[in-house]
Structure formats: C-alpha cells, structure tokens
C-alpha cells in the first residue's frame, strides 16, 4: 500500500489506467489475506488473538486507503464534469458489437459480480494451462446492478428504462428462455444457458450444445454469496469462482472444441469485512 505513491491524479482516465495496472492489487491482496486468515482461525490456533488483532488492523488500513482513493476519485469526477466519456474505456453496452465474431464459434461466460481483481487472478490461473488469456476493462453502465448491466451484454438495438426495468429492444428479458429467444434474433442457432446446466449435462447433449455458433453461459456464484449474512461468504465464493471457471474454460477448449471464449461481468462489488456505516455512504445527488 505504501508503495502506491500519490492517490491524487489528474483525470478519470489516469485513475482507470492506474487501477487496472496497480491499484487493483490493494483489493486483491486484501481478499487473499482475509482468505488466509479464515483458514487459520477455523483450526485450533495458539496465536488466534494475535491474528485477530492483525486482521483488525488490516481492515482499518484497507478502509482508510480505499476511502482516500474514493474521495480523490470523486473530487476528480466533480472537477471534470463529463467524466463518463473521458475514461478511455469501451462501454459495456457495446460489448456484443465489439466482441462478436461470426466467423468463429464463440462462448460468452457472464459471471455475475466478477470484479476486476478477481478476473486478474483468474487470468493468471488460465495462463498456467497454456491458454492464451488476455484481460481488458470495460466501463459498466450506471447504476451497476444486475438487472441493468446483464441485459446490456446481449446484442440489442435499444436499451430503455421502463420504470425500474431495463427493456432490451422493447422487451423485458429476465429468464434464460427469454434471453435465448432474443439472442436468436441476432445469431441463428445461438442459445443462453446456466453454468449448472452445462456442468450437470450429459456428454451427448453438451456436445450438441457447443456445436452452436454462440452460447451465453450465466454464472451467479459470487453475486449469490453477496446476499449472505456471513462476511466471509463472498471471499469464499471468489475462490470457488476462480476454480470453477478455470475448469469450465478448460473443458470448453479440450472437450467441447471451443477455442474462442469470452468471460465478462455485469458488475463488480464493494467489500470490506467490517460493516458499512452510514457515514461511509455518499449522497447520490449530482450523480
């Protein structure tokens, strides 16, 4: 943390570049340290109190640096005004347009709440298997919620709000069947499915599934853990996601003959082991 240098930068683009290159490590190391801490305290340990004290100090240090970084970011946003167009990032709603390739068979894995630092670790795991793995950042839609952002990852001509619902080409897409019907309008034979159905499917049906030109697989493990009352559930779910998605990508390549795999997220998440207080929140006026 002390090696990060200044947290006050001159533009939103600089913040994005700095986060994707270096600042993300603060989130990654915090998560990994909590993971190690939980493994130690679940066993009888003579230094449990010492570990607990060290972990408490870690929580305070993490909260401090993320709070300072967030305040500097918000100051930059307020000063720049039209910050949303100046980050240098591709936009989430253009994902299909940017990444779709009709010349090859593709699988898109949409991982709910896969934040950037977890994706970086996943990429490192995939690289161990001699995959050619690269990572790129996209700018999520606001508000960054599943019901808005997940729909934006599908092909579309229009995205419109109807009350609090996101309409895709004038239609509400909340089920796998609805998403499949919609996807098929843009790519004949394309289909949407769930991770559980893929991993639990029989060999013959999976071979047939991945003969299709485009398959969207929806994976929800991290987001589901975020609704738990246990603060460690999210940390555990991140590790589970890295392991399960590594296995899935390996099977796609080796068993189902899919060479072009895209893995993306609808949104990320904010996390601290300590509970958020009211004074941790920022008023939404002006955003």
Question: What do these predicted regions represent?
Answer:
Residues 1-287:
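Feature captures the catalytic ectodomains and active-site-proximal regions of enzymes
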């Amino acid at each position: 943390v002390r090696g990060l240098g200044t947290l006050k930068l001159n533009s939103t683009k600089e913040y994005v570049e700095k986060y994707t290159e270096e600042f993300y490590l603060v989130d990654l190391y915090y998560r990994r340290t909590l993971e190690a801490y939980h493994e130690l305290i679940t066993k009888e340990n003579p230094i449990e109190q010492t570990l607990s004290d060290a972990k408490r100090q870690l929580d305070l240090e993490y909260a401090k640096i993320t709070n300072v970084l967030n305040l500097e970011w918000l100051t930059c946003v307020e000063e720049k005004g039209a910050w949303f167009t100046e980050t240098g990032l591709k936009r989430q709603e253009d994902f299909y347009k940017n990444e779709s390739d009709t010349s090859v068979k593709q699988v898109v894995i949409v991982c709910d709440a896969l934040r950037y630092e977890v994706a970086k670790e996943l990429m490192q795991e995939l690289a161990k298997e001699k995959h050619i793995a690269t990572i790129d950042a996209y700018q999520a839609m606001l508000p960054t919620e599943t019901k808005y952002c997940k729909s934006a990852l599908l092909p579309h001509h229009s995205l419109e709000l109807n009350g609090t619902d996101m309409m895709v080409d004038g239609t509400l897409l909340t089920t796998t069947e609805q998403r499949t019907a919609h996807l098929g309008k843009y790519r004949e034979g394309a289909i949407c499915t769930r991770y559980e159905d893929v991993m639990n499917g029989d060999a013959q049906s999976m071979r047939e599934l991945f003969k299709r030109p485009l398959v969207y697989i929806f994976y929800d493990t991290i987001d589901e853990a975020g609704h738990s009352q246990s603060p460690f559930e999210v940390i555990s779910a991140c590790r589970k996601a890295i392991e399960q998605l590594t296995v899935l990508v390996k099977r796609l390549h080796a068993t189902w003959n899919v060479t072009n795999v895209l893995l993306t997220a609808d949104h990320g998440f904010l996390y601290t082991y300590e509970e958020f207080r009211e004074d941790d929140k920022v008023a939404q006026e002006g955003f």
